[in-house]
Regions:
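Long, hydrophobic/aromatic-enriched structural stretches that serve as scaffold segments
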Residues: 155-207
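Short, conserved secondary-structure transition motifs
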Residues: 215-243
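C-terminal engagement modules used by replication, chromatin/transcription, nuclear envelope/ESCRT
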Residues: 355-422
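A structured, charge-rich N-terminal accessory region that forms the first stable segment of a protein
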Residues: 87-159
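A conserved mid-domain beta-alpha-beta active-site/ligand-binding segment of alpha/beta enzyme cores
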Residues: 235-316
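Charge-enriched amphipathic alpha-helical scaffolds
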Residues: 309, 332-364
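Short acidic, hydrophobic short linear motifs in intrinsically disordered regions
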Residues: 320-331
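Intrinsically disordered, low-complexity eukaryotic regions enriched in glycine, serine
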Residues: 1-84
Length: 422
């Protein structure tokens, strides 16, 4: 029977699958052999005659995201241990200190309760991966609240005041800084949403002393589908992550501060310097996140951000309209570092419909946003080809993209990044 979760691995299933693949290979199934070779560390040595069960098991473990079959077995046993601990309602893992669990969303809030954690949960949901990141702390919350009201709430068909959004965010900051908590644990993945929330959180905690501050950080997890975030994981897997937390050291704080200062800079030079000249070993996923962040600057030929480019390329594959829901899913498959939720995605794309020559059409704004049908335009095709580039006005962190102050590049080589003045 198939596992209910792509990250709950059934060892007996994998043993059976390995035997079936070996049998198929022995019967000259070239496709099965190539599948094993794709993940084996020594594919050149594998032939129909020489391959052994251990080879198939080794490749299968690597396909699931583990280095060896023995590591796979250990991983499965570990998750079984945590599943039993949850079933037996063992003492909470965070019981020894009054703990605040910080996350950039609500996805694991219930899971933490299921796992038996007793600490409080703080969702810091302001998506710093999109919109302006102000360098003025006194105006930071208000500016971000204005962006949420202007760009995100309309997509959802919701109304809200800047004051209410700002108050909610300030209350979250107050909770983060609350002296009652003896330990703060950040749960983060490798994308820009999580990484920038972490930088923001550590910046806010810069003067905090006498607390344990820790990070649980993952960029992959063994399973049969692509790992995007903790929300995909079963409860026992979430519980197992606890043992991998790391302490926030003075060195990590220093690196985080440097990254934050680069992020709020009005030009990209500081980010480029960080990426090319500095070791950021305490923040293993920040460089990839920073580069992906820079890819939101316009492409030198099309004028599109990388998100817009990928989205329009996905839409260009369809000759008939598709729903926004399907469009987002297809974009996600192309995205090398999935970050955006569906609302954020659509908010970044909608401005492309507001010019004299829209890049995609919408059948009806009266529908729920995820049911709206979208279709690419001829102008978008020309834009993607570079023959009709567009100019836009938007924010990428501390950088304002506008025609009079334009940073563009090929979204590949940082050395191609250049400044255009009109």
């Amino acid at each position: 029977m198939q596992s209910h979760n792509s990250f709950s691995i059934n060892l007996n299933q994998q043993k059976s699958l390995a035997k079936k693949r070996l049998k198929a290979i022995r019967q000259n199934d070239e496709r099965a052999l190539q599948q094993v070779k794709q993940f084996h560390t020594q594919p050149e040595k594998l032939t129909t005659e020489s391959i052994q069960l251990a080879d198939v098991q080794h490749a299968l473990a690597r396909e699931l995201g583990l280095p060896s079959w023995s590591k796979l077995k250990a991983h499965v046993e570990e998750l079984e241990f945590h599943k039993l601990a949850i079933h037996n309602r063992e003492q909470p893992l965070d019981a020894e200190l009054k703990t605040l669990h910080v996350r950039c969303g609500h996805d694991i809030q219930q899971q933490l309760k299921t796992c038996g954690f007793e600490g409080e949960f703080l969702p810091m949901i302001d998506p710093l991966c999109i919109g302006p990141i102000p360098n003025d702390e006194t105006a930071f919350v208000a500016i971000r609240a204005q962006y949420v009201v202007d760009m995100l709430l309309p997509v959802m068909g919701r109304e809200g005041s800047v004051q209410d959004i700002a108050l909610s965010e300030q209350n979250k900051i107050n909770t983060l800084l609350d002296e009652q908590f003896e330990r703060i644990v950040f749960w983060v993945e490798h994308d820009t949403y999580d990484q920038f929330m972490l930088l923001r959180g550590l910046t806010l905690l810069e003067d905090t002393e006498g607390k344990v501050i820790e990070i649980i950080e993952f960029n992959q997890f063994p399973g049969t589908e692509r790992f995007i975030g903790f929300g995909q994981l079963p409860a026992e897997a979430v519980r197992s992550c606890w043992q991998h937390r790391k302490a926030v050291t003075s060195k990590l704080r220093s690196q985080a501060k440097r990254c934050w200062q680069a992020l709020i800079s009005p030009t990209p030079q500081s980010l480029i310097e960080l990426l090319t000249q500095h070791e950021l070993d305490c923040l293993p996923n920040i460089k990839a996140a920073m580069k992906r962040h820079l890819q939101e600057l316009p492409h030198s030929e099309s004028g599109l951000s990388f998100t817009q480019q990928l989205a329009l390329e996905a839409l260009a594959e369809h000759s008939t309209p598709i729903t926004v829901k399907d469009w987002f899913q297809e974009y996600q498959e192309k995205e090398p570092l999935p970050t955006l939720g569906d609302v954020m995605f659509y908010a970044l794309l909608l401005p492309l419909t507001c010019s004299d020559k829209p890049l995609f059409s919408i059948d009806s704004l009266q529908k729920n946003w995820w049911e709206q049908q979208v279709c690419i335009t001829e102008h978008a095709q020309a834009c993607l080809e570079g023959s009709q580039p567009i100019t836009q006005n938007y924010w990428v962190g501390g950088m304002q993209v506008r025609e009079s102050n334009l940073w563009v590049w090929d979204h590949n080589q940082l050395s191609s990044l250049s400044h255009k003045e009109w």
